[in-house]
C-alpha cells in the first residue's frame, strides 16, 4: 500500500486526517495507526469507504492500495 498517495488524496480533497476519519466513521487514532503501518490492516470495507468518500477512480484505488 502507498500511504503517501492516500494521504495526498485526502489532503487534495481538502481534508486533514482527523476530518477524514470522521467522514469514514473511523476513530482518528485507528486511522493514524493504519497509516503508520503502511495500511496493511485496512479491511475491504474500509477500502471501499475510502474509495467512495474520496471519489477515487479504479486506477487510483489500484495505485494506492495494491502493491
Which residue stretches match the model-derived regions?
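A short, Lys/Arg-rich alpha-helix, primarily the initiator
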Residues: 1-15, 23
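Key DNA-contacting residues within the recognition helix of helix-turn-helix
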Residues: 7, 32-33, 62
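Residue-level detection of the helix-turn-helix DNA-binding "recognition helix"
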Residues: 11, 22, 36-37, 66
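The DNA-contacting recognition helix of HTH DNA-binding domains
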Residues: 17, 28-29, 58
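Short alpha-helical "recognition helix" segments of helix-turn-helix
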Residues: 19-21, 50
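Recognition helix of helix-turn-helix/homeodomain-like DNA-binding domains
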Residues: 26-41
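DNA major-groove recognition helix of helix-turn-helix/homeodomain DNA-binding modules
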Residues: 45-60
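Short amphipathic recognition helices of helix-turn-helix/homeodomain-type DNA-binding modules
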Residues: 60-67
Amino acid at each position: 500500500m502507498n500511504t503517501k498517495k492516500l494521504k495526498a488524496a485526502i489532503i487534495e480533497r481538502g481534508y486533514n486526517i482527523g476530518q477524514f476519519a470522521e467522514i469514514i466513521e473511523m476513530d482518528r487514532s485507528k486511522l493514524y495507526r493504519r497509516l503508520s503501518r503502511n495500511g496493511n490492516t485496512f479491511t475491504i470495507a474500509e477500502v471501499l469507504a475510502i474509495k467512495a468518500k474520496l471519489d477515487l477512480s479504479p486506477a487510483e484505488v489500484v495505485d494506492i492500495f495494491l502493491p
